[in-house]
Amino acid sequence: VIECQCFLLSVFIRNGDLVCRNQIFSSTAGTTTISDIVKSLESGKTVIIDTSRLMTQAELLIGSMIAGNTFWRYQKYKSEGVLEDKPIVSVVIEEAPRVLGSDSLQSGDNIYSTIAKEGRKFKIGLIAITQLTSVIPKEILANLNTKIILGNEMATERRAVIESACQDLSSDDQAISSLDIGEAIVSSTFTKFAVPVHFPKFDDLINLDAKEKKPEKIIFR
């Protein structure tokens, strides 16, 4: 089992030392990396973890370590009465069924399901991205207060989305299936009715921002 886990995490032992093929894990460096990331989140910064070079198991391990450390620290702040001074933290997880699917939760809750259920008490939210809503337990879906519904051609998944929506979308099955790129329906406990929205293309938005941004002034004294 240990050898299997080492393979999945791309680590092995060489001359008694821990070696990582993708240079992510180390026995001598990075002792404050997770703490530094959490501190950045506490200061209101956006932190993006690039896991494109990692296998799924390593990616989920790193994400769980960061999310867990943040959650436990915010729990501590609440008990100390200083949580109100901290910014809200949102944890984004892609391919959410990997950690929120029924199969993943057979042996009990993990940090992601815990945040989904209890995070709001500690100013931590979960943004779960998935095309397969049907494999996520209804208990978890019920705790996600806002759903941004994109187009989906799979009838099973549309039914799961409609059943978990905060408003009655039973007559919107066809509308959901025909949503185009950039179009969505927002269903939330914070709105009285579902709201259709349109998102601009990210590349166009960035290019527009770059054109409008004035060059920085340099003053020599």
Task: List each model region and its residues.
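Conserved P-loop NTPase motor module
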Residues: L61, D180-R221
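General structural signal for secondary-structure boundaries
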Residues: V1, D36-V38, E153-A155, Q167-D172, ...
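Conserved ATP-driven motor cores of ASCE-family P-loop NTPases powering translocation/secretion/packaging/pilus
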Residues: G108, T114-P200
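Preference for short coil/turn "hinge" residues that link or interrupt alpha-helices
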Residues: D17, G30, V47, V92, ...
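P-loop NTPase motor domains
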Residues: V1-T114, A184-S188
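Residue-level signal for secondary-structure boundary elements
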Residues: C20-S27, K78, N152, L169-D173, ...
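Broad hydrophobic/π-residue packing in well-ordered secondary structure
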Residues: F71-R73, P97-V99, R120-F122, K147-M154, ...
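Generic structural signal of hydrophobic/aromatic residues within well-ordered alpha-helices
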Residues: L8, N15, I34-I37, V161-I162, ...
